């Protein structure tokens, strides 16, 4: 008669880990508890497609007078990060709502929660479309309960460095092509994009640029996308996250900010670099603790993306610094390649 086995210390540890992962995936037993940041139940995606419910649990929808206008990222039980340009001074705080845990915007889900705003804190350096400081802190009216579908993303510390070429993911509910809205039931869209250095991005944005409308990617910005175009952000969903994976956790590397047209060649998406504002964020919300990002790889030169045009200086041009087409209600995920292939 065989004896029942007794678990040793190593086996007990393995069981504990499996139980913990099971709680995260099921959403039971962990609700109301402090959730670790940057944990998502799904693997990283490639290309552009509809997300799975709960795949990006920090993604929020921001509405004004009941209409979706921007995205945002949950960073704690009561705070969301978005873009400053989503909150014009003439708009009233009371007319905004934040929808958390949503997947299909046009469908009801008991997993989604809606909150009004207690406070909106735009960065003081934000002046106009395309300027520095395109970031805003939003305080929910009351703390939200975490679940499988509602979880925070990690905030990177000020010294965080994300290497060129790192494949990150931008998410949103915006247009899938210029002037083409996302079809009902409007599932959350996701697109994998590689990071591009600021110098190369500046070079790309000044290829065939109009002299009267200079472009300048500033130090508090980061670029991501494809030189050949076709897959990019488009109008409808600024403020949403550019999420980057490092050693199993997702970090809020960028906040969708501005761009020139949708999916145009030599015009990658431009994002507010969240780590540039780590100190400001902590000065406003002391309980928000930015996380040190492990340096797993060095940035590789990407000047070849701009070819012979790289002689462009990274110094700002004189005059008004604004893109040819800035989309005032934000940028949304424009999965142009799949759409173009069907038309």
Swiss-Prot record:
Found in prostate, liver, salivary gland, kidney, lung, pancreas, colon, bronchus and renal proximal tubular cells. In the prostate gland it may be synthesized in epithelial cells, secreted into the ducts, and excreted into the seminal fluid. Its EC number is 3.4.21.-. SUPFAM superfamilies: Trypsin-like serine proteases. Glycans are attached at residue 159. Residues 1-29 form the signal peptide. Disulfide bonds join 37-154, 70-86, 168-244, 201-223, 234-262. Residues 45-286 form the Peptidase S1 domain. Residues 30-32, 323-343 form a propeptide. The active site is at residues 85, 134, 238. One of its GO terms (cellular component) is extracellular region. One of its GO terms (biological process) is proteolysis. The chain crosses the membrane at residues 320-340. Keywords: Cell membrane, Disulfide bond, Glycoprotein, Hydrolase, Membrane, Protease, Secreted, Serine protease, Signal, Transmembrane, Transmembrane helix, Zymogen. Heterodimer of two chains, light and heavy, held by a disulfide bond. Possesses a trypsin-like cleavage specificity with a preference for poly-basic substrates. Stimulates epithelial sodium channel (ENaC) activity through activating cleavage of the gamma subunits (SCNN1G). Belongs to the peptidase S1 family. This is Prostasin.
């Amino acid at each position: 008669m065989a004896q029942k086995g007794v678990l040793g210390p190593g086996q007990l540890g393995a069981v504990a880990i499996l139980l913990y992962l099971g709680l995260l995936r099921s959403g039971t037993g962990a609700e109301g508890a402090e959730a670790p940041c940057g944990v998502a139940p799904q693997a990283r995606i490639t290309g552009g497609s509809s997300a799975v419910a709960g795949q990006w649990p920090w993604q929020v929808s921001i509405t004004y007078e009941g209409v979706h206008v921007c995205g945002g990222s949950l960073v704690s039980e009561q705070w969301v990060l978005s873009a400053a340009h989503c909150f014009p001074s003439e708009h009233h705080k009371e007319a905004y709502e934040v929808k958390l845990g949503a997947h299909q915007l046009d469908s009801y889900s008991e997993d989604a929660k809606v909150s009004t705003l207690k406070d909106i804190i735009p960065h003081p350096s934000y002046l106009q479309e395309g300027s520095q400081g395109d970031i805003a802190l939003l305080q929910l009216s009351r703390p939200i309960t975490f679940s499988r579908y509602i979880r925070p993303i990690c905030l990177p510390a000020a010294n965080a460095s994300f290497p060129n070429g790192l494949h990150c993911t931008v998410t949103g509910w915006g247009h899938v092509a210029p002037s083409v809205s996302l079809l009902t039931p409007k599932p959350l869209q996701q697109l994998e994009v590689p990071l591009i250095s600021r110098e190369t991005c500046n070079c790309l944005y000044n290829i065939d640029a109009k002299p009267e409308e200079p472009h300048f990617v500033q130090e508090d910005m980061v670029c991501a996308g494809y030189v050949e175009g076709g897959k990019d952000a488009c109008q409808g969903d600024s403020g949403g996250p550019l999420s980057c994976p490092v050693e199993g956790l997702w970090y809020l590397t960028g906040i969708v900010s501005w761009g020139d047209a949708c999916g145009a060649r030599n015009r990658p998406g431009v994002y507010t670099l969240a780590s540039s504002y780590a100190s400001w964020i902590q000065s406003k919300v002391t309980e928000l603790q930015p996380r040190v990002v492990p340096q797993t790889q060095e940035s590789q030169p990407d000047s070849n993306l701009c070819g012979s045009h790289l002689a462009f200086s990274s110094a700002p041009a004189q005059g008004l610094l604004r893109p040819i087409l800035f989309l005032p209600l934000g940028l949304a995920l424009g999965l142009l390649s799949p759409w173009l292939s069907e038309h």
